[in-house]
A protein has these predicted regions:
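Cytosolic catalytic headpiece
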Residues: 3-5, 32, 190-191, 381-598, ...
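Conserved cytosolic catalytic loops of P-type ATPases
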Residues: 30-47, 53, 190-283, 382-426, ...
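Actuator/coupling domain of P-type ATPases
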Residues: 57, 61-74, 80, 100, ...
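Bilayer-spanning, highly hydrophobic alpha-helical transmembrane segments
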Residues: 90-97, 305-334, 343-352, 356-364, ...
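Juxtamembrane helix-loop transition segments at the membrane interface in multi-pass membrane proteins
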Residues: 133-141, 176-189, 362-381, 694-701
């Protein structure tokens, strides 16, 4: 029997080091089989049996609170001066300044100044030293252990003031890091808070306010002007403009009428709407986005995996180097024990890997959160990194570069049948097809009649058309190529077809056993934004744009020239699109952009699969590496620029973290670096790295 898996939300998780220790403590619970801790989302997954009390005991060292995932947690705003850690930091500063005052007035340390410095160390560093000594007893060397050794070492050689300064600066930097990380986490918490927690439900002609968790499918909810929509559903009464920016990133409100779909978390701007609930609270689009974003933030990007491997060996190496500096010069070169012991302590402090360890995850978390708020769902750090390296983008045509709503433009009868009869015959077969062109024929036929001809033995011919039996005769609807496979076309028909295709229209033939009945032309309007977006892609480093389509060469070529695409590949079957993606890899990393439904194999084959219209289809959210929630390409250049910017920030962070350490280590040799300066270098690097990453929260990447 599989062990039970429970998911929890956390409060008070302040640093990556604390997260690692918390996870380690939980693993030591006998009844726990596996633990996954998502630091960016403050989320914990436990496989096995562990109570909330046991989990909170495992996180007691950092005051971590644990809540069931579905429980709504109300964040209490605690004033700065009321937080215990800030109170002890302020007390430590007062005692430190008093100690310096006494020391300065007496021309050096005396019992009173030492007592004040010691009090500053014990009050400001109580939590630090308690944790550090516990870790030291287990030979578990982390940041708190290194700092504790440094403070105790400073006291042992009589540098009480230095020890007190180290404690104070460490406390300040911890507070700044915690504040900055909370800011980064706001990208997720703001998503969670988008949808209302209650809704007005209509039952028996009366209005009741209920929690969204208690709503059922087919319940009818009322949304008044200015209110947020609480659940995904279908409009059954009223019409209004709805601002969908929270889900799709679109700034222009969308007019909703009877039968239209609406999403939880979007804003009803004008009229009153009655909406029939179509999804439970945990299945809404915003709930799925939150879940996928949290999973994405937990996934480690290649750069982060490298940094984690490096840090694993880095800390023990620093400990060994520190010990060697303390011992070798006095033993072999006649150096002073006190001087070299102090230098070893400084190396210990400088060597803390905090800034390095956090340099990548904080940038990834912030960038993915920013993208989600702008209507782009990036499903992992690896996809975020790879997007910035893309050199080739392949586009599906229908619904991606075009509007995806083709309309019948021409009907040509070449038999005794009328044009309406040709259309009706085609529609009677196409009503069983899922192809976008079939829907255009159906819409045209609906204007003529409500009843179609009865057909038998319908069969789809993949990528080419369909056939069925009508009144005892086998009738085909398909491409000119399918017709040519069965019978030659006359030169006059060939010219008619070519003329239509050169206008960017897709041609379908209707024929029976007696011969050709008619020709139907369909046109799908190119999106107004497609041309400008293609040009933007070239300016941000995309070298090649390719359209992959099952449409004919002439139509595809006309659209490709209109949009300025590098290359057009036409008359492709689904498996041929996959082969084409593979062949395009010779030019560099390839992204495939489609609707996430018909293009699933090609999306999976590309280095990065990008699906459009994620807000409207679960399939797009599931199949793609990146989902553009709006049904357009507007956010594609933004996504690529965000990826490139994130990579730059990560490299900057790593350079800052390592650069400051190298500089500090060089200053140790001549004895210019003091303990408090070492703390400033280490903690300053951490704060700079976090603040630098927070720049990714801006929309103008």
């Amino acid at each position: 029997m599989a062990a039970e898996k429970n998911v929890y939300r956390l409060q008070g998780l302040t640093c990556t080091n604390c997260a690692a220790k918390f996870e380690k403590n939980i693993r030591q619970i006998d009844t726990v089989e596996d633990v996954q801790l998502n630091f960016g989302a403050s989320k914990l997954t436990v496989t096995g049996d562990a109570s909330i009390l046991q989990l909170e005991e495992a996180g007691a060292f950092d005051g971590i609170k644990v809540f069931p995932e579905k429980q709504r947690v109300i964040k209490q705003h605690i004033p700065f001066w009321k937080k215990r850690e800030n109170q002890t930091t302020i007390a430590s500063l007062i005692l430190l300044l008093a100690g310096y005052g006494v020391s300065t007035s007496n021309g050096g340390n005396n019992w009173l100044s030492i007592a004040l410095f010691l009090a500053a160390i014990l009050i400001g560093g109580y939590s630090l030293m308690k944790e550090g000594l516990r870790n030291l007893s287990k030979l578990d060397f982390d940041m708190s252990t290194l700092m504790t050794i440094a403070v105790i070492g400073a006291a042992l050689i009589g540098d009480w003031a230095e020890g007190a300064v180290v404690v104070f600066l460490f406390s300040v930097s911890e507070a700044l890091e915690s504040y900055s990380i909370d800011k980064a986490r706001n990208s997720i918490s703001s998503l969670i808070d988008i949808a209302p927690s209650t809704a007005i439900v209509l039952r028996g002609g009366k209005e009741f306010e209920v929690d969204v968790e208690n709503l059922q499918i087919n319940d009818v909810i009322l949304i008044k002007p200015g209110q947020k929509i609480a659940m995904d559903g279908e409009v059954i009464q009223g019409d209004s403009s709805v601002n969908q920016a929270a889900i799709t990133g679109e700034s222009v409100p969308v007019h909703k009428v009877l039968g239209d779909e609406v999403f939880a978390g979007t804003l009803n701007e004008e009229g009153s709407l009655q909406v029939r609930v179509t999804k439970l609270a945990e299945d809404t689009t915003i709930a799925k986005i939150i879940h996928l974003v949290e999973e994405a933030q937990a996934e480690k990007a290649p750069t982060q995996q490298f940094v984690d491997r490096f840090a694993k060996y880095y800390t023990p190496a620093i400990l060994v180097i520190s010990l060697l500096i303390m011992v070798i010069p006095p033993l072999t070169m006649g150096g002073l024990w006190g001087e070299w012991f102090y230098k070893g302590l400084v190396v210990l402090v400088v060597g803390c890997p905090c800034a390095l360890v956090i340099s990548t995850p904080i940038a990834i978390v912030t960038a993915i959160g920013n993208a989600a708020r702008n209507g782009v769902l990036i499903k992992g750090g690896i996809h975020l990194e790879e997007t910035g390296q893309i050199k080739v983008i392949a586009f599906d045509k229908t619904g991606t570069l075009t509007e995806g709503r083709p309309e019948v433009t021409d009907i040509i009868s070449v038999s005794s049948m009328t044009e309406d009869e040709v259309l009706l015959q085609a529609a009677s077969i196409e009503k069983f097809s899922q192809h976008p062109l079939a829907s255009s024929i159906m819409r045209a036929a609906e204007k003529l009649t409500d009843s179609l001809i009865e057909v038998e033995n319908f069969q789809s011919i993949t990528g080419k058309g369909a056939k069925a039996v009508i009144d005892g005769q086998l009738v085909h609807v398909g491409s000119p190529n399918l017709y040519r496979e069965m019978s030659p076309l006359g030169s006059s028909f060939e010219q008619q077809i070519l003329d239509l295709q050169q206008q960017g229209k897709t041609v379908m033939m209707v024929w029976s056993e007696k011969g050709l009945n008619g020709i139907i032309a369909v046109a799908d309007q190119v999106r107004k934004s497609s041309l400008s977006i293609i040009q933007k892609l070239y300016t941000i480093g995309i070298e090649k744009t390719v359209m992959l389509t099952g449409d004919n060469h002439s139509t595809a070529k006309a659209i490709g020239q209109q949009l300025g695409l590098s290359e057009v590949k036409a008359e492709l079957l689904p498996h041929e699109k996959v082969q084409m993606i593979k062949s395009l890899r010779q030019y560099g990393k390839v992204a495939m952009v489609g609707d996430g439904v018909n293009d699933a194999p090609a999306l999976a084959t590309a280095n990065v699969g990008i699906a459009m219209g994620g807000a409207g289809t679960d399939t797009a959210l599931e199949t793609a590496d990146i989902a553009l929630m709006a049904d357009d390409l507007e956010k594609l250049p933004y996504t690529i620029k965000l990826s490139k910017r994130t990579k730059q920030v990560i490299l900057q962070n790593i350079s800052i973290a390592l650069g400051l350490k190298v500089l500090a280590l060089l200053l140790i040799i001549p004895g210019w670096l003091t303990l408090w300066m070492a703390v400033m270098a280490d903690m300053g690097a951490t704060v700079i790295v976090v603040l630098n990453s927070l720049r990714l929260m801006r929309n103008n990447v």
